[in-house]
From Swiss-Prot:
GO cellular component: ribonucleoprotein complex; ribosome
InterPro entries, per the entry: Ribosomal_uL5 (IPR002132), Ribosomal_uL5_bac-type (IPR020930), Ribosomal_uL5_C (IPR031309), Ribosomal_uL5_CS (IPR020929), Ribosomal_uL5_dom_sf (IPR022803), Ribosomal_uL5_N (IPR031310)
One Gene Ontology molecular-function label: structural constituent of ribosome
The protein's name: Large ribosomal subunit protein uL5
Subunit annotation: Part of the 50S ribosomal subunit; part of the 5S rRNA/L5/L18/L25 subcomplex. Contacts the 5S rRNA and the P site tRNA. Forms a bridge to the 30S subunit in the 70S ribosome.
Upper taxonomic lineage: Bacteria, Bacillati, Bacillota, Clostridia, Halanaerobiales
Gene: rplE
UniProt keyword terms in alphabetical order: Ribonucleoprotein, Ribosomal protein, RNA-binding, rRNA-binding, tRNA-binding
Purpose of the protein: This is one of the proteins that bind and probably mediate the attachment of the 5S RNA into the large ribosomal subunit, where it forms part of the central protuberance. In the 70S ribosome it contacts protein S13 of the 30S subunit (bridge B1b), connecting the 2 subunits; this bridge is implicated in subunit movement. Contacts the P site tRNA; the 5S rRNA and some of its associated proteins might help stabilize positioning of ribosome-bound tRNAs.
Gene Ontology terms describing biological process: translation
Family: Belongs to the universal ribosomal protein uL5 family.
Segments traversing the membrane: none
One Pfam family from the record: Ribosomal_L5_C
SUPFAM superfamilies for the chain: RL5-like
Length: 179
């Protein structure tokens, strides 16, 4: 079991039960999944770039991503239905906890001028979104071999019903929120 999963069961659950007065342990919010998404409009000019993106996301998350394709043709964006426009991967269970631990303790501190993540990025239903501008902050990416720097979005889906509960859960998991 990963460090973060053990910490959740042994330390975080009792603290959340005390703070929010849950009667049942199953009512305590938990992280259900983490979705890592890369959307790249440049893929229409350079189709070979999709392999690079897929390999990078696979090395970052430890899981092979799914290539996302355009649902409709949009003339203004010069895309046709079915064209590859990005990649995404959904992490659950053990790999999710390991990714979150690595994100909080290794990746986020490596971001230039990092002062914490915004507490305003909750969606109103207890889910949290982080946008990372440069994928090279992840330790698995070798900077020498990178041709193109791109950003990615990370969505943390929790079972919390309110943003306050989700904020407290992520804060106890070590997420560095700025004040």
């Amino acid at each position: 079991m990963s460090v973060l999963a053990e910490q959740y069961k042994e330390e975080i659950v009792p603290k959340l039960m005390d703070k929010f007065d849950y009667e049942n342990i199953m009512a305590v919010p938990r992280v259900e999944k983490v979705v890592v998404n890369v959307g790249m409009g440049e893929l229409k000019e350079d189709p070979k770039l999709i392999d690079v993106v897929v390999n990078d996301i696979a090395s970052i998350t430890g899981q092979k991503p799914v290539i996302t394709r355009a649902k409709k043709s949009v003339a203004n964006f010069k895309i046709r239905e079915g064209m590859p426009i990005g990649a995404k991967v959904t992490l659950r269970g053990e790999t999710m906890y390991e990714f979150l631990y690595k994100l909080v303790n290794v990746t986020l501190p490596r971001i230039r001028d990092f002062r914490g993540v915004s507490p305003k990025s909750f969606d109103g239903r207890g889910n949290y979104n982080i946008g990372i501008r440069e994928h090279i902050v992840f330790p698995e990416i070798e900077i020498d071999k990178v041709d193109k720097v791109y950003g990615l979005e990370i969505t943390i889906v929790t079972s919390a019903e309110t943003d306050e509960e989700a904020y407290e859960l992520l804060k106890l998991m070590g997420m560095p929120f700025n004040q």
